[in-house]
From Swiss-Prot:
Function: Constituent of COPII-coated endoplasmic reticulum-derived transport vesicles. Required for efficient transport of a subset of secretory proteins to the Golgi. The C-terminal Phe-Tyr motif is required for exit from the endoplasmic reticulum. Facilitates retrograde transport from the Golgi to the endoplasmic reticulum.
Gene: ERV46
Swiss-Prot/TrEMBL keywords: Endoplasmic reticulum, ER-Golgi transport, Golgi apparatus, Membrane, Protein transport, Transmembrane, Transmembrane helix, Transport
Motif (Phenylalanine-tyrosine motif): 402-403
Segments on the Cytoplasmic face: 1-24, 398-415
Lumenal side: 46-376
Protein name: ER-derived vesicles protein ERV46
Length: 415
């Protein structure tokens, strides 16, 4: 009884060898099935060994962390002595005149070639970054009316209000809201060589390269002429020297601009740049952009509006890189305002500061790009079995159809 039950459950019924019928069509179908199965198995093996990147969108919970800013910008018609970089955000935090920390400034001649030392930031002095000083212990430099020095005669030397060097006079002028220009006829600036050197550099360009840390909130960074200063009325720059030098402008080349840690380093470490090529482009879409309008842009403001999306890359070798992708929209306008020359129906507001501005806005969402194998082991085995079974099933059906067709044709011929 038990044996007959097992016999009835046998789904693989056998036939005797001497009653089997073999045909040429069956042989061709069998060969085709073998080749098709091998092709599908090789394809499944390739998918199993392939690496894919699967994106995932989550809420960004790292709002307290700083975001790294990396940039390399060239201004062919702005000397390094006049360019300043400020970063401001909606929290009220300001990083003013930060080019002295974390950045290198390279002077460029009219042909765009480097001039002098890339780290040279001081226009006055003895060539070693120091300025000549007055060694008289009783010397008290004049502030030229920018500060009240009327009571100095009644004060001790250490209590007097003095402007001992050119930078002190310039700071006093900024606090008073006065135009400093090039420091001509100011004794401290003449002594330090500031006046002669800054005028010698007015026909040069500047390449600025470096990095800074910014908050993950809305704000802006801007390159503008002259020293920045802040008062109760807002944020300003001393543009006096820029205003009277008509050959200066903020036409520029963005060699590199990115937010977050660069991922090229990991690409080079793995020796597989092609695998990460798309990601590199997404994190720095403005690289190589050149802005040289065919009109006078002396009093012109160039603006980029960047939408930043925090991004994490998780690699198979357990390396995790936190960076950011961004898209940017470009806009430019004359400070004089009025109708746009290219679009007469567009009106520009009047006012502002000449320069290059990048207004950035952070997304509340984060993209996680995770590297994974194309298939798991279980998926690979399942797909292999499915491929083999499917090919055999189709081959069986085709063999039966061909056999019945042959029998039908032979039967008609025999009649």
């Amino acid at each position: 009884m038990k044996r007959s039950t097992l016999l009835s459950l046998d789904a693989f019924a056998k036939t005797e060898e001497d009653v089997r019928v073999r045909t040429r069509a069956g042989g061709l179908i069998t060969l085709s099935c073998i080749l098709t199965t091998l092709f599908l198995l090789v394809n499944e093996w390739g998918q199993f060994n392939s690496v894919v990147t699967r994106p995932q969108l989550v809420v960004d919970r790292d709002r307290h962390a700083k975001l790294e800013l990396n940039m390399d910008v060239t201004f062919p018609s702005m000397p390094c002595d006049l360019v300043n970089l400020d970063i401001m955000d909606d929290s009220g935090e300001m990083q003013l005149d930060i080019l002295d920390a974390g950045f290198t400034m390279s002077r460029l001649n009219s042909e765009g070639r480097p001039v002098g030392d890339a780290t040279e930031l001081h226009v006055g002095g003895n060539g070693d970054g120091t300025a000549p000083v007055n060694n008289d212990p009783n010397y008290c430099g004049p502030c030229y009316g920018a500060k009240d020095q009327s009571q100095n005669e009644n004060l001790a030397q250490e209590e007097k209000v003095c402007c001992q060097d050119c930078d002190a006079v310039r700071s006093a002028y900024l606090e008073a809201g006065w135009a400093f220009f090039d420091g001509k006829n100011i004794e401290q600036c003449e002594r330090e060589g500031y006046v002669s050197k800054i005028n010698e550099h007015l026909n040069e360009g500047c390449r600025i390269k470096g990095s800074a840390q910014i908050n993950r909130i809305q704000g802006n960074l801007h390159f503008a002429p002259g020293k920045p200063y802040q008062n109760a009325y807002g944020h300003f720059h001393d543009t006096s020297l820029y205003d009277k030098t008509s050959n200066l402008n903020f036409n520029h080349i963005i060699n590199h601009l990115s937010f977050g840690k660069p991922i090229q380093s990991h690409s080079k470490l793995l020796g597989n740049d092609k695998r990460h090529g798309g990601a590199v482009v997404a994190t720095s879409p403005l690289d190589g952009r050149q802005v040289f309008p065919d009109r006078n842009t002396h009093f012109h403001q160039f603006s980029y509006f960047a939408k930043i999306v925090p991004t994490r890359y998780e690699y198979l070798d357990n390396v995790v890189i936190e960076t950011a992708q961004f898209s940017a929209t470009f806009h430019s306008r004359p400070l004089a305002g009025g109708r746009d020359k290219d679009h007469p129906n567009t009106l520009h507001v009047r006012g502002g500061i000449p320069g290059m501005f990048v207004f950035f806005e952070m997304s509340p969402l984060k993209v996680i790009n995770k590297e994974q194998h194309g298939q798991t082991w279980s998926g690979f085995i399942l797909n292999c079995i499915t491929s083999i079974g499917g090919v055999l099933a189709v081959g069986t059906v085709m063999d039966k159809l061909f056999y019945k067709a042959q029998r039908s044709i032979w039967g008609k011929k025999s009649q």
